[in-house]
Structure formats: structure tokens, C-alpha cells
């Protein structure tokens, strides 16, 4: 199996924030349990991007679940990739689905889903969900744990 250092180019180094998601480098590392079906979850409670029309900030909680195959996403590179969206203008759907697709292309997981729970803009919350296919029956798949937006009261 390859060493982690072969694949994790940013780990253990001072790494500047990428200027854009397109410029961000996502790293993957070998999965030491590739023979086992299990779920890995990343919860991102303070995701930000910009409205592509007004330039105003948008906020979301992202929940990324995946059943890895040969590869795991290296978490520092994921953090830097997601942080690069804070000055990136895109609609909620584009951010959410684009992140899911980029991770799926990189990792080639057995299964992946992303839930984007966006705070209201113009009085309307937008929740966006994307997945690669049917979830595996052999894996415990907990609820994403983000309640629907109810406003105040």
C-alpha cells in the first residue's frame, strides 16, 4: 500500500487558502480498511459562499456521507477546498452538487451523498441533496441530523 505522504501533499505543511474551489487541491489517501463497508461523515456547520448575482454571503450546513472503497479524502485538503468557496459566487445547487461530484470523481467511493442545508435568502431556505446511487444495505446510514428550517418561533 502507498504511504500517506505519497498522496497527502498538504498535510503537515503550512498551506495558503486556495483562491477558488477550482484551484484547490483535494488529496486522497489509501483506505486501510478497503475490504470493509463503513460510513464516513464530514459535517461542515459553517460553510459559506457568495450569491453569484448580489455578491451577498450565503451560509449552509453541509453533511457529506460516503462509503469509501480504495481511497479516503484527506481532511485538511477537504477543509481548504471548502473554505475556498467563501469568495466564490455560485447558486446553492451548484455548490452542493459540484462538491459531491468532485469528491465522487476523486474518491470513486462505493457510495456518496451530500446534503446542503442553506439558510434563507429572500425568505426561502433551500436544501439540496445529491447522491451517487442507491445506498448500500450493509452500512448503517444515520439521519443527517439537520432539522428542516423553521425560522423563529
Swiss-Prot record:
Single GO molecular function: preQ1 synthase activity
One GO term describing the cellular component: cytoplasm
Sites where the protein binds substrate: 73-75, 92-93
Active site: 51, 58
Any single GO BP term: tRNA modification
Subcellular location, record wording: Cytoplasm
Alphabetized UniProt keyword annotations: Cytoplasm, NADP, Oxidoreductase, Queuosine biosynthesis
Pathway: tRNA modification; tRNA-queuosine biosynthesis
Family under the similarity heading: Belongs to the GTP cyclohydrolase I family. QueF type 1 subfamily.
PANTHER family, alphabetized: NADPH-DEPENDENT 7-CYANO-7-DEAZAGUANINE REDUCTASE (PTHR34354:SF1)
Function per UniProt: Catalyzes the NADPH-dependent reduction of 7-cyano-7-deazaguanine (preQ0) to 7-aminomethyl-7-deazaguanine (preQ1).
Protein known as: NADPH-dependent 7-cyano-7-deazaguanine reductase
Species per Swiss-Prot/TrEMBL record: Methylorubrum populi (strain ATCC BAA-705 / NCIMB 13946 / BJ001)
Lineage, opening ranks: Bacteria, Pseudomonadati, Pseudomonadota, Alphaproteobacteria, Hyphomicrobiales
Amino acid at each position: 500500500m502507498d504511504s500517506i505522504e505519497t498522496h497527502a501533499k498538504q498535510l503537515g505543511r503550512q498551506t495558503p487558502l486556495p483562491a477558488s474551489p477550482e484551484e484547490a487541491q483535494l488529496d486522497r489517501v489509501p483506505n486501510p480498511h478497503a475490504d470493509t463497508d463503513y460510513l464516513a461523515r464530514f459535517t461542515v456547520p459553517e460553510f459559506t459562499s457568495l450569491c453569484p448575482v448580489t455578491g451577498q454571503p450565503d451560509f449552509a450546513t453541509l453533511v457529506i456521507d460516503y462509503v469509501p472503497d480504495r481511497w479516503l479524502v484527506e481532511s485538511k485538503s477537504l477543509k481548504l477546498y471548502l473554505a475556498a468557496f467563501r469568495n466564490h459566487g455560485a447558486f446553492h445547487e451548484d455548490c452542493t452538487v459540484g462538491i459531491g461530484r468532485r469528491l465522487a470523481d476523486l474518491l470513486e467511493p462505493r457510495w456518496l451523498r451530500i446534503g446542503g442545508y442553506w439558510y434563507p435568502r429572500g425568505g426561502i431556505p433551500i436544501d439540496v441533496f445529491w447522491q451517487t446511487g442507491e445506498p448500500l444495505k450493509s452500512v448503517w446510514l444515520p439521519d443527517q441530523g439537520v432539522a428542516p428550517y423553521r425560522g423563529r418561533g
